[in-house]
């Protein structure tokens, strides 16, 4: 049954203008050769060459460079175990040299799934996710795997560096030393994604970029704050749709964990003074251009009236351990559903119970009931 506390949540809601919402239609995106070409040539310095990358048949020059990096790490190692680990890995790389290719293979028709090229003085890899299974789509950009990120941002005494969002940083609060402003970095990201053919997005979060330096024993030597981690999401009529990643859904009908994935389209870019450091883009859908405007919506009052019956009917068939349900997250939002082989974003009232995680966060991504 619904708790009386839920009515307090209802009273605090700001109900948006409900006569201007639409239904928008989408197809599942196809990561075809043209898609790959557009992304690669939008990022790499094409004049310097774009090449395929094969994990099975690596390029000899890559292996030689990686061997050189690990030989230096072996020299810096402070224990026999560390040195043994590096030396064993060097031996495996030298074994791969026997069958490595002497020349890189050009991108050609972009039918491969991974490509390498340069951006300024640095090399990067772009990897694409296939949509053939209907489970993934998009791409990632990473600093070239045969190099170490420490070569991109070296620091005396450090053998490695790891960069991540300040959301996960618990060190001393210092100023962001990047000369690029947060607003300019956000615009850089939007411009890059637009060049990839991804324009219907909106920025939903921006944090500082942390660079954490370590020695060969992975002891942290120093941390610096320089750059930004920017998150964009699909924009439907100018707002980010409701795309929860709900897990541990309560049900007594199954002993297994129950979860629900809405294929959240998220585009996360790390940007510093040199530009894009990395990117992780989940580009699942593409708008068809079709749109049904000013659709009729159930009113707020009618939605609240219908809620108790809907909840009680659902849990009559799906038993729960909850004795009461207190919705603490209510919103009018766009939500994606599948209709045949197409998808549509349509306006819905969302009533959710979200519970706090160990870090105190309470969001639509936590354990919950919708």
Spans of features found by a protein language model:
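C-terminal structured interaction module
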Residues: 360-370
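Segments that shape or occlude catalytic/ligand-binding pockets
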Residues: 169, 185-361
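Preferential activation on post-signal-peptide N-terminal prodomains/segments
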Residues: 1-258
């Amino acid at each position: 049954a619904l708790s009386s506390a839920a009515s307090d949540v209802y009273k605090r809601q700001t109900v948006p203008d409900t006569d201007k919402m639409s239904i928008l239609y989408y197809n599942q995106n196809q990561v075809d050769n043209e898609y790959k070409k557009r992304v690669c040539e939008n990022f790499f310095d094409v004049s310097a060459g774009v090449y395929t990358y094969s994990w099975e048949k690596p390029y000899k020059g890559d292996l030689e460079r990686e061997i050189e990096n690990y030989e230096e790490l072996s020299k810096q190692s402070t224990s026999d175990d560390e040195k043994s680990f590096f030396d064993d890995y060097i031996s495996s790389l030298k074994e791969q040299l026997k069958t490595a290719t002497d020349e890189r293979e050009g991108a050609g028709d972009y039918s491969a799934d991974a490509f390498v090229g340069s951006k300024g003085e640095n090399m990067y890899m772009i990897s694409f996710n296939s949509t053939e299974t209907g489970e993934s789509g998009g791409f990632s950009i990473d600093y070239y795997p045969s190099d170490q990120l420490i070569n991109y941002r070296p620091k005396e005494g450090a053998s490695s560096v790891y960069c991540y969002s300040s959301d996960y940083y618990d060190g001393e609060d210092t100023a962001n030393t990047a000369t690029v402003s947060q607003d300019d970095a956000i615009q850089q990201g939007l411009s890059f994604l637009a060049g990839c053919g991804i324009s219907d997005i909106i920025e939903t979060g921006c944090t500082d970029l942390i660079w954490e330096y370590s020695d060969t024993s992975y002891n942290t030597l120093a941390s610096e704050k320089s750059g930004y981690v920017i998150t964009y999401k699909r924009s439907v009529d100018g707002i980010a749709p409701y795309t929860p990643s709900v897990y541990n859904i309560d049900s007594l009908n199954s002993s297994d964990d129950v979860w629900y994935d809405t294929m959240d389209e998220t585009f996360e870019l790390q940007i510093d003074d040199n530009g894009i450091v990395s990117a992780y883009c989940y580009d699942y859908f593409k708008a068809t251009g079709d749109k049904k405007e000013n659709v009729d919506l159930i009113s707020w009052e009618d939605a609240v009236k219908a809620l108790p019956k809907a909840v009680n009917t659902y849990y009559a068939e799906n038993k729960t351990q909850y004795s009461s349900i207190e919705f603490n997250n209510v919103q009018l939002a766009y939500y994606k559903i599948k209709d045949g082989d197409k998808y549509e974003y349509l306006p819905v009232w969302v009533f959710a119970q979200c519970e706090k995680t160990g870090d105190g966060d309470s969001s639509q991504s936590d354990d919950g009931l919708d």
